[in-house]
């Protein structure tokens, strides 16, 4: 074999010796080169003497053959080739999908009937459904806000307020497109969050103009005066709200990239709404408002009456019992805050996609054919599930990248992946299907089978991940095995993965060099001869008449384990010697797979949490186990997965929260020229935070990344009510009113706008909260519940604290 390899390699070398000049012409000289016809290979002389000529065709079979498959792919039970296309940044997925479909339709016309093209899934379908859902939430919120404005303020006032919404959106979307973000999932959510906020400015201005028009017959003057009276207050309130969102742009890591377009959108919408509230809203009010009092009493009339008759009286009594009210308020504050320990913590929820992934790991050393057989057996059961529409198999490899945070794994013969495309996404049906698949495949001993749902957020490890660090592989294997057994015993821990204990069994060829020398074996040729016998050796290229290149592989007929010792090698005397005469063939454990973490050896043990179980609770139990475990010398552990991502992301968000608070406080100090009044305004924040905890506790939702973002958003939102109240109090004091009457009058006149802005903000977020799915529900619940509790604090606690910490001139004590 070695002789044939050397002969063919020399024959296939493509060398240009040089050129020859003949008069005015120059000719390149070509002596040999790549094979161009099968006959050339067949007729190659491998041995010749005076008696005979032996050609390659006399001792070998020369033929075209397919390369041995390293992985297999199937769709609808038939072999396929999967093609995927990824979208470039700043391109439209719908236009891209349409262009691809046109190309596919044209290409289909050129195919024979034996080849079909089928679409497994289109990401644009999910995007379209999600975008339509967000726009539905937006329209529903818009309708709710409009109806609330209509019921509260009347038709003319509601029209003026509602006009501000589309104009603010159009201006902001233009700015958003100019900034390079465009409309995407997070920016649309930003529009929904901003929906309830952007009308606040228009409501406050409209309500102020509505009050002023009763004092004068000059509607234009009333509009200008009403807007000017609250101009600084709404400007300050808008800036503080923007300050709650702007620091989110500094959030590092993949999480920051994921959410970045949302704060940009909110800030741009709020800026547009402020410009409209200070300019267009007074103009429209001067044109549309009626000079005559409407005969139809709006809800604003009854709310104003309630505030003037009952609320002021109750507040006056409560202000006489300041100590009791403050103690009661802070007891309630701490009681709500204590619920945080009972609220679960998570990072990102399920993606709610109509697809499932199933990882299949057959035992080490499994052949590709065996893995293929196991996976096809799995499809027999999966096809009985009515909710499954399509099944795609990749045997010996993972699927191409089909979701933004799903990274394909390195392919091996003992690994495969199934993609299940469901008829639709229905949470109840998906949960039933996942439970059925896990129950069925958990009893299979042919392979380790993991059923996975897609998750939201950036790329992370499995939610529960422990990294064991040590330079001792034996220690890593032992501790990882103990830890894996512990995690497997924890209720709710599923999809356990601990790859370090997995090692292939290898066939080791132990050479007896003395026997090899006595047999006349050239040791240098031994490895190459065995390679040719088992895998084949590439010796050159074959070029057909069309210019296509094909590698030439020389190999022996395949041998099984029993025939391995019969492989022969030609010794120096030209005799065929079976390798079994000088080689001992034995089985041995191969190298253990392990990872590196910061250049140190690492074992990774990871798992998922079942839907009804908390990742944090399981992680806490794992940490408790490791803390009580006697780790070998030099070994330590690190937490990865959701715990690591949460610490990184929440640490960044905590810094953002601090920056937000400092920025808002600085703005308030500049506005009120006081340190104590901003502190009074800031009392709204702890009540909003504890209200958010109460909302999560009541709804049973976890404190997630989106909930944290909602909490930061509350910082800027809830202080607006207190700003308006304290600012109006200062204006009343500037008109030489006594302190308590000034506070009571401010509380009465601002009761309606505070109530209405709170209700409209809640109304704008209500569709997203109820229908936006598991990713957005915590955000909506946090803002809504925080607003409700902080509004109560604005109506009771802020007036009491304002009386305590404000002099009769409205300045700091």
Model-derived regions, located:
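Solvent-exposed, membrane-proximal periplasmic/extracellular interface segments of envelope transport
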Residues: 1-13, 32-34, 370-459, 515-536
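Hydrophobic transmembrane alpha-helices and their membrane-interface caps
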Residues: 143-211, 268, 666-750, 755-772, ...
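Helix-loop junctions and hydrophobic alpha-helical segments within the transmembrane domains
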Residues: 120, 127, 131, 206, ...
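Signature of alpha-helical transmembrane segments and their immediate interfacial
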Residues: 230, 297-349, 375, 389, ...
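Extracytoplasmic/periplasmic membrane-proximal domains and adjacent transmembrane bundles
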Residues: 1-143, 206, 224, 484-660, ...
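Transmembrane helices with small-residue packing motifs
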Residues: 177-178, 249-257, 326, 330-366, ...
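Transmembrane alpha-helices and their membrane-interface boundaries in multi-pass membrane transporters
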Residues: 195, 199-209, 231-250, 257-297, ...
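Structured binding elements
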Residues: 262, 686, 775, 779
């Amino acid at each position: 074999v070695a002789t044939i390899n050397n002969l063919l390699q020399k024959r296939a070398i493509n060398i240009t010796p040089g050129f020859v000049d003949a008069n005015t012409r120059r000719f390149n000289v070509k002596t040999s080169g790549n094979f161009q016809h099968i006959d050339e290979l067949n007729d190659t002389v491998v041995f010749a003497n005076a008696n005979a000529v032996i050609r390659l065709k006399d001792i070998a079979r020369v033929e075209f053959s397919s390369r041995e498959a390293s992985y297999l792919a199937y769709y609808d039970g038939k072999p396929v080739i999967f093609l995927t296309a990824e979208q470039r940044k700043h391109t439209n997925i719908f236009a891209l999908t349409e262009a691809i479909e046109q190309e596919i339709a044209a290409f289909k016309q050129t195919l024979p009937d034996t080849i079909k093209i089928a679409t497994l899934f289109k990401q644009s379908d999910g995007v379209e459904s999600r975008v339509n859902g967000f726009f539905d939430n937006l329209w529903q919120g818009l309708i709710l806000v409009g109806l609330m404005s209509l019921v509260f303020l009347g038709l003319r006032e509601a029209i003026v307020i509602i006009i501000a919404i589309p104009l603010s959106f159009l201006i902001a979307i233009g700015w958003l497109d100019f900034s390079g973000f465009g409309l995407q999932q997070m920016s649309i959510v930003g529009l929904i969050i901003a929906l309830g906020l952007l009308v606040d400015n228009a409501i406050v201005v409209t309500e102020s103009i509505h009050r002023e028009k009763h004092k004068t017959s000059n509607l234009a003057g009333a509009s200008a005066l009403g807007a000017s009276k609250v101009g600084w207050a709404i400007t300050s309130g808008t800036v503080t709200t923007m300050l709650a969102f702007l620091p989110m742009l500094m959030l590092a890591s993949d999480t920051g990239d994921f959410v970045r377009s949302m704060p940009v959108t909110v800030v741009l919408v709020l800026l547009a709404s402020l410009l409209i509230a200070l300019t267009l809203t007074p103009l429209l009010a001067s044109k549309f408002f009626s000079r005559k009092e409407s005969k139809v009493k709006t809800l604003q009339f009854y709310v104003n009456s309630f505030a003037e008759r009952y609320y002021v009286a109750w507040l006056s009594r409560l202000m006489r019992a300041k100590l009791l009210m403050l103690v009661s308020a802070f007891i309630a504050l701490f009681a709500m805050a204590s619920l945080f320990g009972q609220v679960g913590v998570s990072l990102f929820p399920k993606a709610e996609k109509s697809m499932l992934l199933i990882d299949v790991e057959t035992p080490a050393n499994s052949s590709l054919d065996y893995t293929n057989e196991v996976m096809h057996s799995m499809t027999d059961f999966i096809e009985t599930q009515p909710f499954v529409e399509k099944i795609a198999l990749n045997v010996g490899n993972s699927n191409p990248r089909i979701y933004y945070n799903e990274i394909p794994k390195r392919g091996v013969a003992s690994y495969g992946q199934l993609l299940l495309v469901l008829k639709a996404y229905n949470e109840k049906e998906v949960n039933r299907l996942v439970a059925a698949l896990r129950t069925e495949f958990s009893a299979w001993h042919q392979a380790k089978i993991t059923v996975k749902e897609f998750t939201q957020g950036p790329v992370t490890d499995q939610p529960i991940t422990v990294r064991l660090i040590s330079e001792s592989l034996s220690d890593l294997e032992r501790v990882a095995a103990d830890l894996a057994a512990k995690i497997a015993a924890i209720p709710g821990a599923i999809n356990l993965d601990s790859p370090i204990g997995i090692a292939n069994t290898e066939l080791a060829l132990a050479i007896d060099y003395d026997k090899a020398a006595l047999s006349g074996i050239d040791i240098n040729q031994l490895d190459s001869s065995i390679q040719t016998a088992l895998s084949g050796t590439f010796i050159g290229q074959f070029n057909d008449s069309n210019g296509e290149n094909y590698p030439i592989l020389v190999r022996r007929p395949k041998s099984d384990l029993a025939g391995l010792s019969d492989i022969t090698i030609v010794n120096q005397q030209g005799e065929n010697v079976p390798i079994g005469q000088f080689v001992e063939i034995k089985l041995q454990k191969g190298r253990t797979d392990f990872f590196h973490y910061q250049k140190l050896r690492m074992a990774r043990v990871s798992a998922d949490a079942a839907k009804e179980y908390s990742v944090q609770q399981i992680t806490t139990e794992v940490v408790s186990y490791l803390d009580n475990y006697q780790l070998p010398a030099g070994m330590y552990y690190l937490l990865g997965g959701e715990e690591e991502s949460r610490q990184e992301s929440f640490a960044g968000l905590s810094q953002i929260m601090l920056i937000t608070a400092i920025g808002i406080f600085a703005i308030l100090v500049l506005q009120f020229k006081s340190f104590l009044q901003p502190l009074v305004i800031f009392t709204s924040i702890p009540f909003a935070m504890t209200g958010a905890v109460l909302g999560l506790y009541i709804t049973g939702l976890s404190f997630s990344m989106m909930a944290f973002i909602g909490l930061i958003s509350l910082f800027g939102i809830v202080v607006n009510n207190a700003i308006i109240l304290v600012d109006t109090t200062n204006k009343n004091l500037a008109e030489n009113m006594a302190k308590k009457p000034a506070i009571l009058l401010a509380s009465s006149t601002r009761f309606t706008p505070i109530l209405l802005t709170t209700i409209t903000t809640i109304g704008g977020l209500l569709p997203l909260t109820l229908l936006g799915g598991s990713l957005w529900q915590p955000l909506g619940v946090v803002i809504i519940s925080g607003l409700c509790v902080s509004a109560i604090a604005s109506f009771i606690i802020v007036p009491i604290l304002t009386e305590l910490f404000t002099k009769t001139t409205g300045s700091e004590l």
